From Swiss-Prot:
One of its GO terms (cellular component) is cytoplasm. It comes from Ralstonia nicotianae (strain ATCC BAA-1114 / GMI1000). It comes from the Bacteria. InterPro entries: IGPD_sf (IPR038494), ImidazoleglycerolP_deHydtase (IPR000807), ImidazoleglycerP_deHydtase_CS (IPR020565), Ribosomal_Su5_D2-typ_SF (IPR020568). Gene3D superfamilies: Imidazole glycerol phosphate dehydratase, domain 1. This is Imidazoleglycerol-phosphate dehydratase. Disulfide bonds: none annotated.
Length: 196
């Protein structure tokens, strides 16, 4: 069973293309026009073992907001498309990831109910030119279009780069766990309702 998807999103602000393979090896080709976002998408691909190809052009002459948010939206749509009816998936995933002084926890549920709890007490407003608030916009876009519940907690950290990077690495690992096929649950929906 192939769990690949390709989604494009074209608006007056951005043009986004995301292609992915949930059963990949972490290969990636990333060109969003926002270098720090490319760095974070690399974390998702490598730690989630998702092959990821993302290209984006956007109104970055204004700021990076629309590009970052729309990449999150398009990635969410692609994951939802690739995962299909969710039969046989583990459904839940979680991960703790440290990076030096920083530690983050991410928990995901492919519930079909979009919800985001994002608790990251950033220690500064920017990492290089990247506005740290855009990380929540990325995950909000993802959650609303993948149909997942996502809890993100940075438990400690002093360096804002480390805070964000641990979040994206933990997200990749939690995603990998949740979308794995459980051989004991082949062909069944992981819910007592029989639907997600």
């Amino acid at each position: 069973m192939s769990r690949r998807a390709e989604v494009t999103r074209n608006t007056s602000e951005t043009q986004i293309r995301v292609a992915l393979d949930l059963d990949g090896t972490g290969k990636q080709t990333l060109n969003t026009g926002v270098p720090f976002l490319d760095h974070m998408l690399d974390q998702i691909a490598r730690h989630g073992m998702v092959d990821l190809d993302v290209t984006a052009t956007g109104d970055t002459h204004i700021d990076d907001h629309h590009t970052v948010e729309d990449v999150g939206i398009t990635l969410g749509q692609a994951v939802a498309k690739a995962i299909g009816d969710k039969k046989g998936i583990v459904r839940y995933g979680h991960s703790y990831v440290p990076l030096d002084e920083a530690l983050s926890r991410v928990v995901i549920d492919f519930s079909g109910r979009p919800g985001l709890e994002f608790h990251v007490p950033f220690t500064r407003a920017r990492v290089g030119s990247f506005d740290v608030d855009l990380s929540i916009e990325f995950f909000r876009g993802f959650v609303n279009h993948a149909g997942v519940t996502l809890h993100i907690d940075n438990l400690r950290g002093v360096n804002a780069h480390h805070q964000i990077e641990t979040v994206f690495k933990a997200f990749g690992r939690a995603l990998r766990m949740a979308v794995e096929i459980d051989p004991r649950a082949a062909g069944t929906i992981p819910s007592t309702k029989g639907a997600l």
